[in-house]
Structures are given as structure tokens and as C-alpha cells.
UniProtKB/Swiss-Prot annotation:
Residues 1-185 are annotated as: NADH dehydrogenase I subunit C. It is a peripheral membrane protein. NDH-1 shuttles electrons from NADH, via FMN and iron-sulfur (Fe-S) centers, to quinones in the respiratory chain. The immediate electron acceptor for the enzyme in this species is believed to be ubiquinone. Couples the redox reaction to proton translocation (for every two electrons transferred, four hydrogen ions are translocated across the cytoplasmic membrane), and thus conserves the redox energy in a proton gradient. It comes from the Bacteria. It catalyses: a quinone + NADH + 5 H(+)(in) = a quinol + NAD(+) + 4 H(+)(out). The gene is nuoC. It is an enzyme of class 7 (translocase). NDH-1 is composed of 13 different subunits. Subunits NuoB, CD, E, F, and G constitute the peripheral sector of the complex. This is NADH-quinone oxidoreductase subunit C/D. It is found in: Cell inner membrane. One of its GO terms (molecular function) is NADH dehydrogenase (ubiquinone) activity.
Amino acid sequence: MNKNICLSASHKQNNRDDPIINELINYFGNETFTIQSTRIGVPVVWVTREQILDFLIFLKKKPNSYLMLYDLHGVDERLRNNREGLPAVDFTVFYHLLSIKSNSDIILKVPLLEGDISLPTATNIFSNANWYERETWDMFGIIFHGHPHLTRIIMPPSWVGHPLRKDYPARATEFNPFVLTKEKEELEMDSLTFKPEKWGIKHSNHKDDFMFLNFGPNHPSAHGAFRIVLQLDGEEIVDCIPDIGYHHRGVEKMSERQSWHSYIPYTDRVEYLGGCVNEMPYVLAVEKLAGIVVPDRVNVIRIMLSELFRINSHLLYISTYIQDVGGMTPIFLAFTDRQKIYNVVEAITGARMHPAWFRIGGVAHDLPHGWNMLLKELLDWLPNRLEHYVKVALENSILRSRSEGIASYSAKEALEWGVTGAALRATGINFDVRKWRPYSGYDNFEFEIPVGNGISDCYSRVMLKVEEIRQSIRILKQCLHNMPAGPFKADHPLTTPPPKERTLQHIETLISHFLQVSWGPIIPANESFQMIEATKGINSYYLTSDGNTMSYRTRIRTPSFPHLQQIPSVIRGSLISDLIVYLGSIDFVMSDVDR
């Protein structure tokens, strides 16, 4: 085994030579912030809460500006042992900014002490900071002064406590037995009653009373347990309030009680249609922490499975969109067609929707005999079938008239709300992580990135997904014809058990193997980050290791969360029927939103 790989895990990057660091020094001075060395791959800068808004404004307005607030969340640092490079801090709030123009990121961190965990809101700078700040307060109790509506967003309104704090229990057995009394039931029902005045919404204008309508949480066009409270003037939507959290299962909290390996099955279920696509950012982030380099065969196998699941998810999206507009037949065709993809996935992984097949350092096992024939049959059949969807439904004049120009927004609006994926590319912005920040060997493949003509509307979004399927087919053909030989797992002590004969000769090897199998591998203390182009936009994992067998903090940034936050800004002034079409064009599942 290559022992140098283990040593590389201690290597840290401070990105001091990054141009943005020099710009910050020239503008603010080098005494106003400190740089943290991590394995994230982007500059990480600590600033005070008094300065955070000035830094955000500067970064957003400078040339090659960071126009997108990609993520915002928190960390409870109180139980963290490895604090090298950290200031005095009990809680951290981090702001992850993304510049499409310069294809670069920067992370700003604000340290907070337990006596005063508050800082000013960034909602006046980035519109999408609203939900992220609400989630951070919900999970950690961190207060954002000046926020327009700092209330629960993931947890129920009556919830007590902040679940991602380290002193909050992580198991049901650590709580008192749950008893639902009549009084508590009435309290819960009352907390779900929509009170317009709490949201700053008026009951009427100077001449008419508004009607309030609950859309969901069990409406078929809501695509999951999702509620939108509509303020209506007749059929026109005056305003609306999306209400999420019904699908929340605490997947980030679960990571704190699972080993690095045993957490992999949970990643499948964050966006339950994506399968192996969701495993990719997690295993890549762990491999970055541990300094593991996987064989070429592993990279191509991972890409092959990811593109199979991308096609599978896109077929469901396209067919359900057609159903939302009024066409019933394609949805039944799609479920039949998707089974062909599941048959290939099952033959390779042994499972269908949630394979949990990627491993830290490789995949669970090698490709089975005959995999290439199964994939070839699928690729020979799929292109003509895709054209059938286009000609029969997507080019239909009724569908086009109900889709074109509906729920449209510009590139500027998309960046402001943190939109990624096909919805962003439909505005004309050519940004696909597989091309611009290639991972797992995507830079060795030839494929194009479909881009829209400047305005993202319902029709352009769905048609881009059609073209993305064509490009995924192109990638899969290259996997079929150019699959490298070699091992399916890295020869690394954190990923691969030692040969049996070695364990019989060296007791230390057997002990190490026993501990890794029973307790799990110990990943070096550090922080890492990995984003990927998932089925619905950019998905990423931000991992913090404290040098233990489990993650200290796992932050999962999903694309659907900001996409639903954008709904009110897009749909105001439209009809309820347009809302149905718009929701169908977003491509989301609530597990991806609520996590």
C-alpha cells in the first residue's frame, strides 16, 4: 500500500495566493480577517460580525463579483477538540459565495461566543439569505437581527429546542416518552393555522377582501408534502407563502451518530430519485479529507451509474411535467421505460432506487459479467424512445402554449435566489459543475452543456432536460466503449481490508482491521467540501472531521431548497393554473428540500 497517501491527508490549503485574498487585503487591510487552512479547496476567511455585511457587499459589487449566496449555515463548535486555525468560538456561521463569472468561491466565517449568538441579517444583500437564516436559527438558535420573519422553517412551529446543537439528543431513546394529549393536539393544530398578519400580509386592499387558499400539503401537483398558502384576488395570486419541513428527518443530525462508511445509505435518500448521484459528493468529500486517490476504473464506473440515474430522474420529471399540463399517457410510458434503467442498475449494484453502492475509495464490487451488453441494449433503445416523448407531447401546441412564457425569470434573478442546474442554464448561463469543475474524471469525457436563450420559463426548463438526457447517453456510450481495466477500490488502509495472509502474520494488521470494521475508520481532522452536478441542480457536502470515526458536522446543500424559496417572486401576479405548471417545471422532491 502507498503510505504517502496517508501522509497527504495532513496537508492543508490556505489559498493565500488566491487573487480574492489580495483584493480583500487591499480593501480592508490584512488585520481585519484571518485565513483558515483546510482541505476545502477554496479560500476560508474569518471575519467579525461587525464586518460581515461590509465583506458581503464588497464581494457582491466588485468586478468578477460573487453574485450568488450559494449556502449559509452554522456549526456548534463547543465540543470540537481539534481547533487549529480557529479563533475563540462556540458557534460559527458561514457564508459560501459563488462567482459564476470567475468560476471561484469564497467562504466567510463569523465566530460567535455562547453569551451572544447573534449577528445582522444579510437579507438586504442576498434575497435567498432569508430561508438560510431561518434554518440556521431553527437548527442552532442563532439570531439574525433585522430578519423580516425569523421563525421556524424546518421544524414545526411549536418545537422546543434547536436540533443541531451538540447538547440536543440525537436518538429517540434519549427523549421522554411521547404522549399526545388533547391539549397538545389542539396546540399543534392551532400552530398550523395560517395567520396573515404574522407574515405582514393584508386581509384586504382598499376595495376588495382577499381569499386565502391552502395549496397542499397533500395536493397531487405539490409533488410531495408541501404546502403553499395563496393570497388570491379571484384567480390571481397576489402573494404566497411556501411552507416546508413536513418531510424532514434530520439527515444532518444522523451523520453525527453514524460512522463514515455507515452513513452512505442515508445519502441516497436525501434526493430519493438520484440514487448513486447523491453518494458521489459525500464519498468524494471524505476521500478529500483522507487523501485517497481512486483508480481510473472507479471514476468511470461512478460516472456511468450517475448518468444512468440522471436519465432516470429526468424521464420522471419530463413525464410528470406533461401530466401536470394535462397529458396522461407519457407518465405511464415513463414508468415502464424507467424500469429498463433500473434493470441495468440492479444487475450492477444489486439494488434499484437506493443502491448505497459507492464506497469511500471505490465501489462495493466490480462490474458483473455481461454488464456491457445490458447497457448497450439500453443505449440502442433509449434515443428513439426519447424522440417519441418530444414528438407526441413536448411539441404539442397546447403544451407549448401553456408553458412558453410562464413563470419566467432572468439570469440576474436566478443568481439572486441561488438557482442552479438546468433552471439556471435556461437563462443563458453556461455553468455545469461537470464541465467547469470536473470531478471523478468528467474532464476525460466529450459532451455538451445545453444552454437556453436568456429567459428561463417552464418550456425552456423542460426542453433543456431533454437535451441533457441526450448528452448523458453520449457519456454512457463512452463509458461502454472505454471502461478502464484495473481495481474497483483504492489500495488504501482506510478503504480496503488487508490481505488475509498479512493478518495471519502481523497481529497489528489484524487489530487495525478489526477496529476499522467494528468502529469504522478514523478520518484525519480537517474540513472538506465537494459540489457535484446532481439531477436537480448543484448538490454539495461540507464535512468537518474532528479526527474521529464519525463526522463532527455534515452540511448538505441541496438545489431544491433555494428553488422553492424563489416561488413567490416568480408567481406573483399569475393564475393558480400557472402555479401548477410552474411547480411541475422546477423538478424537486421534498426530501431534497427538507432533508
